[in-house]
Amino acid sequence: KTESSSVQGVIIESVENIANVLKRGKKIYAAAFNGLAQQDLDALKKNKKQIIKLSDEVDELRDNVFYFIKNLDDSSVGASNFYILILGYLQDMTQSLTYITKVSHKHVHNNHKKLKFNQIKELSQINDSIQQLFSEAIDTFSSQSFERIGSIIEQKSKIYAILKSNIETQVQRTRTEESSPKNTTLYFSLLLETKDLLNATTGLLEEYHTEY
């Protein structure tokens, strides 16, 4: 029997895995944005390898869920529910990061038009917000200061507002000045997938916040 026979046990044992996924996810998101802004195909290619590796590791955790549940005692059904929900959020996060990484790589690989200055500026603002949220989440998990989660989750609505505003701006741009369908598609894809990444990350945090 592992220590993980209670929800508290799962929280303690999973902290390292979560901090690891957050650290690498933060880097992968930044690398996708920077590679796209600088049209750096090599960097985007390397980033693609990183997310494949991370996805495989999260999949491996999911593949071991059978043994995790078998290992629990009868009083610990809550722990398995918690663990399965956490795995779901981790998978959602890696799926969003995979999509962001792949579309960024594909856009540059296929020599499509570079994103416009304003688009890069707007994405830079989002990247900064995501980096800040991830940094605070990493600190929280590394130090097990789960009482700080509430204030991190509050950042979600601020980032949502930025995403919404950028979507509206791009709609306006597309109607008046944008000449590249590929650019428009890429830009909307990045915004929407960032929203999904944000939902998965804050969902994960909320789960810990509730249980802790």
Regions found by a protein language model. Name each.
Residues 1-212:
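Cytosolic, long alpha-helical scaffolding segments
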